[in-house]
Amino acid sequence: MAQGEIVPRPSPFDGLPENCISNIISFTTPRDACFAASVSKAFESAVQSDSVWEKFLPLDYSSLVPESRVFLSKKELCFSLCRVPLLIEGGKKSFWLDKTSGEKCIMLSPKGMVISWVNSPQF
């Protein structure tokens, strides 16, 4: 061993089944899952699981994402929804996922709003 060489030590997580690690990671955020994957081989493998990324998606994601959009994995879908908003409800709303928290975000377009005082001369 050369001086200054870093020797990886076994992780206490190495003995856990992958589905157990996947379950633990699914209680975090997409960002935390990516960080975890970068620090441990056991985590890296577990983070690739669709079961992890399915939990980061909103419960109603399948009704929001058009069938014409095909994704190879739930991770790819999650990343896509963080980068590219989807127009929903006939273009009256825009839907995406927050990159940091994974929370569902919806923006209303002016077409989707009714402002009762818009024609009032007072305003």
Swiss-Prot record:
Residues 10-56 form the F-box domain. SUPFAM superfamilies: F-box domain. PANTHER family: F-BOX DOMAIN-CONTAINING PROTEIN (PTHR32278), F-BOX PROTEIN PP2-B2-RELATED (PTHR32278:SF57). Gene3D superfamilies: 1.20.1280.50. This is F-box protein PP2-B3. It comes from Arabidopsis thaliana (Mouse-ear cress). The gene is PP2B3. InterPro entries: F-box-like_dom_sf, F-box_dom. PROSITE patterns: FBOX. CDD domains: F-box_AtSKIP3-like.
